[in-house]
């Protein structure tokens, strides 16, 4: 099995280092990852300037670009073969509920899926530096073997979130759906020493709806959450209702 690894925390992140270590035990690994942190870039693709890549290890490439760039460049140029699987992570911080729409980690898995390659995004549920990246990486490695053996439904990729706990303390994985988060955005508005305004986009304390069966419900109770995500964003349940509208 040959696996392409990437992330959005950057090529030198501890989560990626843990993933390399654990996945290398079950597969041949090549890393194509951003040269710096690219958190919250979602599915951004670099189109207005050239991409540059540097080989910084035997099978490790650092790219001046987004996670989506890395998957594109890896599959279409840097690798001499088509990987059997793409794994993105281990992200520092959860990618659950509505946050998946912002996530560069999840978007890298989406990009691989668009190319017809099975993919997994894996994140460590923590608001601090994170302690148990290896436990999350071990979960990803085990799941990679299962996905390689069984395959995934068409246009489907997996979003995995692992509580920041020692491996022996993790509860069994649960198959979940995407949850819901309540956003109360804030803008930090300041003035620099030259009298110019500058801003930071921030949020107040975040809250999630604790709904049984969701990713948040699982991880908040110590379970590993595995959510099957899909390329098709259509709300199929609303189609018939919208057809009844008197559209202009």
From Swiss-Prot:
Keywords assigned by UniProt, alphabetized: Cytoplasm, Hydrolase, Metal-binding, Nucleotide-binding
Family matches, as InterPro entries: SurE (IPR030048), SurE-like_Pase/nucleotidase (IPR002828), SurE-like_sf (IPR036523)
Spell out the reaction equation it catalyses: a ribonucleoside 5'-phosphate + H2O = a ribonucleoside + phosphate
A GO CC annotation recorded here is:
cytoplasm
Organism's domain of life?
A: Bacteria
Q: Does the keyword Transmembrane apply?
A: no
Cofactor names from the entry are: a divalent metal cation
Enumerate the transmembrane spans.
none
Quick one: which residues bind a divalent metal cation? Answer: 8-9, 39, 91
Assigned EC number = 3.1.3.5
Gene3D superfamilies named in the record = Survival protein SurE-like phosphatase/nucleotidase
Predominant location:
cytoplasm
| Cellular compartment(s) | Cytoplasm
How and how many cofactors are bound, per the record note?
A: Binds 1 divalent metal cation per subunit.
Q: List the molecular function annotations (GO) for this entry.
A: 3'-nucleotidase activity; 5'-nucleotidase activity; exopolyphosphatase activity; metal ion binding; nucleotide binding
Record flagged with keyword Nucleotide-binding:
yes
Sum up the protein's function in the record's words.
Answer: Nucleotidase that shows phosphatase activity on nucleoside 5'-monophosphates.
Q: Which family does it belong to?
A: Belongs to the SurE nucleotidase family.
Q: What is this protein called?
A: 5'-nucleotidase SurE
């Amino acid at each position: 099995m040959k696996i392409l690894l990437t992330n959005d925390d950057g090529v030198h992140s501890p989560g990626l280092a843990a993933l390399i270590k654990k996945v290398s035990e079950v597969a041949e690994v090549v890393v194509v990852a951003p040269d710096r942190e690219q958190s919250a870039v979602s599915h951004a693709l670099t189109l207005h300037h050239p991409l540059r890549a540097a080989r910084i290890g035997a099978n490790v490439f650092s790219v001046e670009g987004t996670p989506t760039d890395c998957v594109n460049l890896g599959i279409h140029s840097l690798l001499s073969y088509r990987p059997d699987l793409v794994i993105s992570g281990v992200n520092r911080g959860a990618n659950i509920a509505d946050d998946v729409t912002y996530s560069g980690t999840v978007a890298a898995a989406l990009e691989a899926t668009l190319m017809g390659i099975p993919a997994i995004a894996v994140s460590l549920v923590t608001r601090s530096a994170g302690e148990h990246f290896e436990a999350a990486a071990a979960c990803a490695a085990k799941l990679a073997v299962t996905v390689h053996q069984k395959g995934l439904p068409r246009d489907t990729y997996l979003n995995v979130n692992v509580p920041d706990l020692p491996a022996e303390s993790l509860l069994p994985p649960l198959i979940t759906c995407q949850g819901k988060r309540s956003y109360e955005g804030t803008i930090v508005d300041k003035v620099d020493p030259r009298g110019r305004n500058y801003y930071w986009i921030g949020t107040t304390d975040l809250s999630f709806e604790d709904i049984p069966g969701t990713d948040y419900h699982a991880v908040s109770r110590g379970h590993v959450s595995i959510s099957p995500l899909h390329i098709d964003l259509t709300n199929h349940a609303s189609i018939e209702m919208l057809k009844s509208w008197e559209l202009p």
